[in-house]
């Protein structure tokens, strides 16, 4: 069966967007690598943004100079860029496999809207557009960091973080109700390459994206307070404590969002929790390396407690997710969309007619009326019907006494 014109248009749009995504992926892979080598057009090494040797938590912002605050050092920044690059490589392989799977599955289209449902299951054009926006913004972020523009880099990374949040939600929910997602998944032919891509490879890619989102939450928190610390007359220690507290608060909203909304679409979404553990390790490294600086500013205990709360809250949220998974497995409740064909059995139960004493002068008229009524009742006897949307109930002839008193 051929797909509808609307589905064909959606598929062609998806293919063109996928080509742009592949090109943007290559560019996002080239930019970080070239930015690490000198004499290739980048003025500075983007990883070395903050010199922790000059870190003083009791100082205030110095005009016309980059005041060092809490940020990623070259090893941590390299780990972050590498993990994001690995996730993008896996996503590249996933979308390439998805395109091959859709080409093979087009031969098994059995409905007018099957192709668009499969495209949405793999990744709609909206998801690809958000992925392209992520790849573009991370390139701009690296280039801006090379020029040491901390204010512009914070703004660019805010756009990148916003695109990452929307992209993660789109990968999990497809911005559709649960029953629509179930209907799209049920339309995929079983034991096919498309089935394997959607139900086995896509959860892995989604969890990798969620893990990267946790790391991006850390970088976003540090970037915001790095820009604030170099824009206003604030103490460096306050900016460090503010960055830690922001990274402590933001994941709580994601934990709540996961249990309220995202868990209905993807139960085993542990990528964000794993990313939070890695981000906590990255955040605690400066506290360990430069312990004397934090101790002299009397911030070591406060920052250490706040940093320790982050993995504790993550562990609690992960335990809640695991308990809810086991609870749903015990209940065995799985909601599926109702079939389009509904069978209704309409049983015929004659209604009791009130007994009245007929008038002698109208016996002949009543007998003729009752005979016609019995014939119409036989014609309108309810039968078992099969309706696609709604069933028409048989008309009943209750009593002719209301017409012929």
UniProtKB/Swiss-Prot annotation:
One of its GO terms (cellular component) is membrane. It is a multi-pass membrane protein. Belongs to the herpesviridae glycoprotein M family. Its main location: virion. Interacts (via N-terminus) with gN (via N-terminus). The gM-gN heterodimer forms the gCII complex. Residues 1-17, 98-121, 171-192, 267, 321-405 are intravirion. The highly charged and proline-rich cytoplasmic tail might interact with the virion tegument. Keywords: Disulfide bond, Glycoprotein, Host endosome, Host Golgi apparatus, Host membrane, Host nucleus, Membrane, Transmembrane, Transmembrane helix, Viral envelope protein, Virion. This is Envelope glycoprotein M. Residues 346-405 are annotated as: Disordered. Residues 39-76, 143-149, 216-245, 289-299 are virion surface. Envelope glycoprotein important for virion assembly and egress. Plays a role in the correct incorporation of gH-gL into virion membrane. Directs the glycoprotein N (gN) to the host trans-Golgi network. It holds the Pfam family Herpes_glycop. It is found in: Virion membrane; Host Golgi apparatus, Host trans-Golgi network; Host endosome membrane; Host nucleus inner membrane. The chain crosses the membrane at residues 18-38, 77-97, 122-142, 150-170, 193-215, 246-266, 268-288, 300-320. InterPro entries: Herpes_glycop_M. Residues 386-397 have a biased composition (Polar residues).
């Amino acid at each position: 069966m051929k797909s509808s014109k609307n589905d064909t248009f959606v598929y062609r749009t998806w293919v063109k967007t996928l080509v742009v995504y592949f090109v943007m992926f290559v560019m996002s892979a080239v930019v970080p690598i070239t930015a690490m080598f000198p004499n290739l057009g980048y003025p500075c090494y983007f990883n070395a943004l903050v010199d922790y040797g000059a870190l003083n938590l009791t100082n205030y912002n110095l005009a016309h100079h980059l005041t060092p605050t809490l940020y990623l050092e070259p090893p941590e920044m390299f780990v972050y860029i590498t993990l994001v690059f690995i996730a993008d490589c896996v996503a590249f392989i996933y979308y390439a496999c998805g395109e091959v799977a859709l080409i093979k599955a087009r031969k098994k289209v059995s409905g007018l809207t099957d192709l668009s449902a499969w495209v949405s299951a793999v990744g709609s054009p909206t998801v690809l557009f958000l992925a392209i926006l992520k790849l573009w913004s991370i390139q701009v972020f690296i280039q801006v960091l090379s020029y040491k523009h901390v204010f512009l880099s914070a703004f660019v990374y805010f756009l990148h973080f916003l695109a990452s949040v929307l992209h993660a939600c789109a990968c999990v929910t497809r911005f559709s109700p649960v029953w629509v997602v179930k209907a799209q998944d049920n339309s995929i032919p079983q034991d096919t390459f498309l089935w394997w891509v959607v139900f086995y490879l896509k959860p892995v890619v989604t969890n990798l994206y969620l893990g990267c989102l946790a790391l991006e939450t850390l970088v976003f928190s540090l970037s915001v307070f790095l820009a604030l610390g170099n824009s206003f007359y604030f103490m460096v220690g306050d900016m460090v404590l503010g960055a830690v507290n922001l990274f402590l608060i933001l994941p709580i909203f994601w934990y709540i969002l996961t249990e309220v909304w995202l868990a209905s679409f993807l139960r085993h979404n542990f990528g964000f929790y794993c990313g939070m553990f890695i981000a906590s390790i990255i955040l605690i490294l400066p506290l360990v390396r430069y312990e004397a600086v934090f101790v002299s500013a009397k911030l070591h205990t406060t920052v250490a407690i706040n940093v320790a709360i982050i993995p504790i809250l993550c562990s609690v949220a992960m335990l809640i997710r695991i308990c809810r998974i086991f609870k749903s497995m015990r209940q065995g409740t799985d909601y599926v969309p109702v079939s389009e064909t509904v069978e209704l059995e309409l049983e015929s139960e004659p209604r009791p007619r009130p007994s009245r004493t007929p008038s002698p002068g109208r016996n002949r008229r009543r007998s003729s009326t009752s005979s016609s009524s019995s014939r119409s009742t036989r014609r309108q006897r309810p039968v078992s019907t099969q309706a696609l949307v709604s069933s028409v109930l048989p008309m009943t002839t209750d009593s002719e006494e209301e017409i012929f008193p």
